[in-house]
Design a protein with these regions (language model features):
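Short, basic-rich loop-to-helix N-cap that marks the start of a DNA-contacting helix
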Residues: 247
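Conserved catalytic core of sirtuin-type NAD+-dependent deacylases
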Residues: 1-244
């Protein structure tokens, strides 16, 4: 077994204050693509790049076009949690993982059983009326066409942080607090290039910074442990070993 994975297993065994920070790579193993890596594919079908469509100004100006893309590319109702999601939920159940901080909006961590999940970019599971603030579930968006409207006539907006919008300060402060006090910080499935989210890891004060990503990241040089493998296989395998040892 890879010696870095052996070391990570040891750190997980010994710690009861693990914080996980994840990006799109955590969900690709559930069949949800990282739209940044396939811009060309989307550009064939849409007149604008994803970053433009998923912006606040585009939503306000071209709401129908926004929803055409959103239903087509951002909602994956058949996606199921993978080994990474289940491993983290299990570690939380054992009192080891204190929080999952995610850049993803798919709700798969909660579906796997994690309770303390901080969603930096919001979630597709919730939507709200911009006029009366009534909430609607994901199904409502999927089962309507065009621009979804509330009973009051207001336009419904996904509870997702779009480009040009600020992250929720309360969520950020909570994430900073967890990271600052973490013993082990595991960062996985993210290129660490999207700010301000990527800047959160600068608050870590410990000496067990773990990076799990298939490709190199700008922070590889400051990490205490770097594993260039899929996150599901890595965490899933470790969790299997850990739980069988603990049984």
């Amino acid at each position: 077994m890879n010696e870095n994975i052996v070391k990570l297993e040891k750190w997980i065994k010994e710690s009861d204050n693990i914080v996980f920070f994840g990006g799109a790579g955590v969900s690709t193993e559930s069949g949800i693509p990282d739209f940044r890596s396939v811009d060309g594919l989307y550009n064939r079908k849409y007149d604008y790049p994803p970053e433009t469509i998923l912006s606040h100004s585009f939503f306000m100006r071209n709401t129908e076009e926004f929803y055409r893309f959103y239903r087509d590319k951002m909602l994956y109702k058949d996606a199921k949690p993978n080994k990474a999601h289940y491993a983290l939920a299990e570690l939380e159940k054992q009192g080891k993982c204190k929080a999952v901080i995610t850049q993803n909006i798919d709700g798969l961590h909660q579906a796997a059983g994690s309770k303390e999940v901080l969603e930096l970019h919001g979630t597709v599971k919730k939507n709200y009326c911009m006029k009366c603030h009534k909430f609607y579930g994901e199904e409502y968006i999927m089962n309507t066409s065009g621009v979804p409207k509330c009973d009051c006539g207001g336009i419904i907006k996904p509870y997702v942080v779009l480009y040009e919008e600020s992250l929720d300060n309360d969520v950020i402060e909570k994430a900073v607090d967890y990271i600052r006090h973490a013993d082990v910080l595991i960062i996985a499935g993210t290129s660490l290039t999207v700010y301000p989210a990527a800047g959160l890891i600068d608050y870590y004060r410990g000496n067990k910074l773990v990076l799990i990503n298939k490709s190199v990241t700008p922070k590889d040089n400051i990490a205490d442990l770097v594993i260039h493998e899929p996150v599901g296989e890595t965490l899933g395998g470790i969790c299997l070993l850990y739980t069988s040892d603990a049984a």
